[in-house]
């Protein structure tokens, strides 16, 4: 609950509310709408009729729990049952049965679905709203050409344009256009009806010559002319029913279906009163659009801003799931139709249950969640990541834009985004501006528009009324900006406030304001709202910060921030990381796995998450925080989750930081840290990796899991139990066997060695005919085995593969190469870990934990980190935590600076440490070099900011290769750690080696270690016998490839070898 001094209290909406409400809307309305569209199906003789009775559909509660669905790689779904009837028309008999249509994946309260054991989330999409839009462009002569674009509900486009002679054309394809009279006539109007329904009939008559009269002489002629231009068909086509059907399918269905949103937009734009249930484009719409186009030509009316949010619509999870359900019903209709015809043909008596099968619906949803671009794997790096992922908005996807073709204007911030789409939080790279994030208070309205709340300012009533306004509505009001929140109404003189009106920012008197913002964070997303002093940062750095907070790794010992914004608790609550009491009661038992809550005469068991792996290999873990015997209330926090402390989000640590150079170790965003962070586990995190192996039934027999693996050392098998699976609690190293498995194979008699055949003949010893296919621990996977699961797919078939999963936990301290970041876009890589005694230390003897480069602040203009740094120091000394809303300058000038200095001054007085606040250089202090004990020349800013450890860790990136695969074409090592790739020396690396004059190393890089096939084969042999490695005599493979590519361009390139002794030229073919 958040309030302000001038009004009542407002509640922040649930951060997962948009996703969950969308799914509920699909279940309540979307299912019924699509089921009502399901037609009655008759056989070819029209003797049997099949139909669904929509009023009695039901969804069954799943038999498994969410956690089991994840572990067993199943889909957490509900079975859909509908009543269906089969009617025999001759006897009027009807057979009614409840049939199973298929499974619909369910969504939990966090807005996620579990499909095949994977958490997935559906992203909301921004599309151009269907309707008509007018714009003006300059032709090659510099004359304005006005066009009106009609966008259908399917995304199809048709254009009306008016030329210099005021003639109106309809562009039916990129190259062809027809007269508006021909189009209207083809849609069913005659000339008299056209002239009666337009405002400017004389303009329509002005370009009506004899040729045009002939084209619109009859409906058939108009349709033929329209078809000829649309299909680019020459000759004289003949009017027929098939021609009309083709035109209906290819043009009218794709480009003329407006939908309910398009019909509403069309009526409002053209002042029409066509009923909302008439969702197709009518001749009346075409003529009204032409009238509006004529008005624009003569200076009446206004052009449309295509990037305004009033011209966009949100394609929510409800719309996407409803579309897929409709597609599944179309497939089901085809199946039922074919089954009825087959049953009649074979003289079988069908029943509703025999006609309907579940695969169409089940497979449609599985393919949607698995393949659709807007269905993504939920990012579960930390609790904040899970919330933010569900609130993304994407311009990409089917029917939307692409990263290559989107213009700068579309990516840019628009005034209509105010309070609806965050101006800060977007992705970096090619998709910048195309993937945004919802503002905190934004919601999706009934017509698919984004709505934002405002307080209405009225002189007639003293109460506060909150309005949710769509993007087009708030332009007619004077909306006061953020700093109007602190007005003192007792002062009678006129007060001037900044306000927004018709996409412009003005300064007006308070009496003229109609609406005002309800909350300082109203414009920002969750990620941007967690940045303290965000108003002092450059927007680019705030963008990086909101993205990097999502990459923070949950630490083993979390700590909440000293300086925050107040939204940390709400973010933790809505993330699902906390265990919350569902009712009142008393704690009767607690352990690491569950909490027992007694109340209302029964006992409720609340399970806790124990060392659960996320899909980013981070550790999800809950720790109970209520003692046994304590009485609790409903909604109280029972257990903290990963990266939460006391019910608040805790992604990092408050560490002592100095901004100063130190021997060049923190240049170019490098960071110098103290070994205290390593030894005291300040930035230690746990990571859980999953390794799995499948057992199949092959043609030679089933694969066998065993601990008796021939030809392997006993040391590698030391951790296996009797079944051949690694034991819980074992410490495993690289190369150890996690699961022993043998695969049977056929071995011919001739392939045995002579001694094997002798043993078989004399002693009857059977030599192993199985191949070892064990699960081995890869490089970098060392750790402790914390869980082993042996899973068999449900169904009972012997051909279902069994899956064995081994979970290994790794403890990772911070080390050189890891990435750390603050909350202001100040990121860096650990360059050196210094002993504590060598780190700079304060006047009270405490050594600094981190040293940042001060040059990273002025050029990047993220000064908020300095305010946070100094206020964090004061808070640590005073044992206080601060929660500061942004834009505090709305209360007084330099409010942030005054707050920080006053807290530092108070900390200096209470701790009797005058160095905490020195008036000559406030916020700075003289510190000492730990190596010499001498003070540094200049005072240094010291403080306690909140620093995060990011998931970009050196253990996941560092890689070495001794042998591996080569690319087929270039014969060079593959690229990347995942493919066991090797070094790839580019031209800049060659320049660097040339600069040092290392000729032999350079030759090795370009030949033996790269793509010289014969030379690298000779290296192995000469190394084994201890000989000298011969110099390669011919060109490497990449040079030969270049020669061949030049030959394909008819260019011949030859190279020669010149002898050092007699300078003879020896020509070698490439």
UniProtKB/Swiss-Prot annotation:
Its main location: plastid. Its EC number is 2.7.7.6. One of its GO terms (biological process) is DNA-templated transcription. The keyword Plastid applies. It is found in: Plastid, Chloroplast. Coiled coil: none annotated. It holds the Pfam family RNA_pol_Rpb2_6. Keywords: Chloroplast, DNA-directed RNA polymerase, Nucleotidyltransferase, Plastid, Transcription, Transferase. GO terms for molecular function: DNA binding; DNA-directed RNA polymerase activity; ribonucleoside binding. Disulfide bonds: none annotated. One of its GO terms (cellular component) is mitochondrion. It is an enzyme of class 2 (transferase). It comes from the Eukaryota. It catalyses: RNA(n) + a ribonucleoside 5'-triphosphate = RNA(n+1) + diphosphate. In plastids the minimal PEP RNA polymerase catalytic core is composed of four subunits: alpha, beta, beta', and beta''. When a (nuclear-encoded) sigma factor is associated with the core the holoenzyme is formed, which can initiate transcription. Belongs to the RNA polymerase beta chain family. DNA-dependent RNA polymerase catalyzes the transcription of DNA into RNA using the four ribonucleoside triphosphates as substrates. This is DNA-directed RNA polymerase subunit beta.
């Amino acid at each position: 609950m958040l309030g302000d001094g001038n009004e009542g209290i407002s509640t922040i909406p649930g951060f997962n509310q948009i996703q969950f409400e969308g799914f509920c809307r699909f279940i309540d309305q979307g299912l019924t709408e699509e089921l009502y569209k399901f037609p009655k199906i008759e056989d070819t003789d029209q003797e049997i009729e099949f139909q669904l009775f929509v009023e009695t559909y039901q969804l069954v509660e799943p038999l498994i729990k969410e956690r089991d669905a994840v572990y067993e790689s199943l889909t957490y779904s509900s079975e859909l049952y509908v009543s269906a009837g089969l009617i025999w028309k001759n006897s009027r008999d009807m057979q009614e049965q409840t049939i199973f249509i298929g499974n619909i994946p369910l969504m939990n309260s966090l807005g996620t679905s579990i499909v095949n054991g994977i958490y997935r989330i559906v992203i909301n999409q921004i599309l151009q709203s269907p309707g008509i839009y007018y714009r003006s462009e300059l032709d090659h002569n510099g004359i304005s050409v006005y066009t009106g674009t009609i966008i259908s509900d399917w995304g199809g486009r048709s254009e009306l344009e008016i030329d210099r002679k005021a003639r109106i054309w309809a562009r039916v394809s990129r190259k062809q256009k027809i007269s508006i009279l021909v189009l209207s006539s083809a849609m069913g109007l005659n000339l008299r009806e056209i002239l009666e329904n337009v405002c400017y009939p004389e303009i329509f008559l002005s370009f009506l010559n004899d040729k045009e009269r002939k084209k619109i002489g009859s409906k058939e002629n108009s349709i033929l002319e329209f078809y000829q231009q649309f299909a680019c068909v020459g000759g004289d086509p003949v009017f027929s029913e098939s021609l009309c059907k083709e035109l209906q399918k290819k043009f009218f269905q794709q480009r003329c279906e407006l939908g309910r949103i398009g019909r509403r937009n069309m009526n409002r734009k053209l002042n029409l009163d066509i009923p909302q249930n008439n969702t197709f484009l009518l001749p009346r719409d075409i003529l009204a659009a032409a009238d509006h186009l004529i008005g624009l030509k003569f200076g009446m009316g206004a052009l449309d801003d295509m990037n305004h949010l009033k011209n966009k619509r949100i394609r929510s999870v409800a719309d996407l799931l409803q579309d897929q359900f409709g597609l599944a019903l179309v497939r089901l209709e085809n199946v039922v139709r074919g089954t009825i015809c087959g049953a009649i043909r074979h003289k079988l008596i069908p029943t509703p249950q025999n006609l309907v099968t579940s695969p169409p619906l089940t497979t449609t949803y599985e393919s949607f969640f698995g393949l659709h671009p807007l269905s993504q794997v939920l990012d579960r790096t930390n609790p904040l990541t899970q919330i933010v992922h569900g609130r993304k908005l994407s311009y990409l996807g089917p029917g939307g834009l692409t990263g290559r073709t989107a213009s700068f204007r579309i990516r840019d911030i628009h005034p209509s985004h105010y309070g609806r789409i965050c101006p800060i939080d977007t992705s970096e790279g090619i998709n910048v501006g195309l993937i945004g994030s919802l503002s905190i208070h934004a919601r999706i309205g009934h017509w698919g528009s984004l709505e934002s709340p405002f307080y209405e300012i009225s002189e007639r009533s003293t109460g506060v009324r909150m309005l949710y306004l769509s993007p087009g509505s708030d332009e007619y009001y004077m909306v006061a900006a953020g700093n109007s929140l602190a007005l003192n109404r007792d002062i009678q003189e006129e007060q001037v406030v900044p306000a927004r009106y018709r996409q412009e920012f003005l300064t007006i008197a308070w009496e003229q304001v109609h609406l005002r913002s309800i909350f300082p964070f109203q414009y920002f997303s969750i990620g941007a709202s967690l940045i303290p002093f965000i108003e002092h940062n450059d927007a680019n750095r705030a963008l990086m910060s909101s993205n990097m907070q999502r990459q923070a790794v949950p630490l083993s010992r979390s700590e909440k921030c000293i300086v925050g914004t107040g939204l940390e608790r709400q973010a933790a609550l809505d993330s699902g990381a906390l265990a919350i009491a569902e009712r009142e009661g008393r704690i009767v038992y607690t352990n690491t796995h569950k909490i027992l809550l007694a109340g209302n005469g029964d006992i409720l068991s609340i399970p806790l998450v124990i060392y659960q792996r996320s899909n980013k290999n981070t550790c999800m873990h809950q720790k109970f925080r209520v003692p046994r015997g304590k009485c609790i209330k409903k909604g109280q926090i029972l257990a903290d989750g990963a990266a939460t402390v006391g019910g608040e989000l805790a992604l990092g640590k408050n560490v002592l930081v100095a901004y100063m150079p130190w021997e060049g170790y923190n240049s170019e965003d490098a960071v110098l840290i103290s070994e205290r962070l390593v030894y005291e586990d300040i930035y230690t995190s746990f990571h859980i990796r999953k390794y799995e192996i499948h057992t199949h039934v092959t043609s030679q027999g089933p694969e066998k899991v065993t601990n008796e693996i021939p030809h392997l050392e006993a040391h590698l098998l030391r951790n296996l139990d009797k079944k051949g699976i690694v034991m819980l609690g074992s410490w495993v190293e690289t190369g150890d066997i996690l699961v022993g498995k043998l695969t049977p194979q056929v071995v011919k008699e001739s392939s045995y060695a002579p001694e094997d055949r002798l043993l078989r003949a004399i002693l009857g010893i059977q030599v192993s005919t199985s191949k070892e296919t064990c699960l081995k621990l890869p490089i970098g996977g060392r750790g402790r085995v914390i869980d082993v699961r042996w899973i068999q797919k449900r169904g009972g078939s012997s051909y279902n593969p069994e899956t064995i999963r081994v979970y290994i936990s790794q403890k990772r301290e911070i080390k050189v190469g890891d990435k750390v970041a603050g909350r202001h876009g100040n990121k860096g890589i650990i360059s050196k870990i210094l002993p504590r005694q060598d780190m700079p230390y304060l006047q009270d003897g405490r050594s600094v934990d981190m040293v940042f480069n001060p040059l990273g602040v002025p050029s990047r203009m993220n000064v908020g980190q300095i305010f946070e740094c100094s206020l964090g120091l004061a808070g640590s000394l005073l044992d206080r935590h601060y929660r500061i809303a942004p834009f505090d300058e709305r209360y007084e000038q330099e409010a942030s600076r005054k707050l920080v200095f006053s807290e530092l001054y108070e900390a200096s007085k209470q701790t009797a440490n005058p160095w905490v606040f020195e008036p000559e250089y406030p916020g700075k202090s003289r510190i000492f070099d730990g190596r010499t004990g001498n003070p540094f020349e200049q005072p240094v800013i010291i403080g306690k900011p909140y620093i995060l450890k990011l998931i970009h860790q050196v253990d996941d990136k560092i890689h070495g290769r001794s042998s591996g695969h080569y690319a087929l074409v270039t014969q060079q090592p593959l690229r990347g750690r995942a493919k066991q790739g090797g070094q790839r020396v580019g031209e800049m690396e060659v320049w660097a080696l040339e600069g040092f004059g290392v000729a032999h190393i350079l030759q090795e890089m370009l030949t033996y270690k790269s793509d010289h096939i014969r030379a690298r084969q000779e290296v192995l042999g000469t190394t084994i016998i201890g000989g000298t490695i011969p110099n390669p005599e011919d060109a490497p493979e990449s040079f030969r490839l270049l020669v061949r590519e030049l030959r394909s361009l008819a260019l011949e390139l030859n190279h020669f070898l010149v002898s050092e002794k007699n300078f003879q030229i020896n020509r070698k073919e490439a």
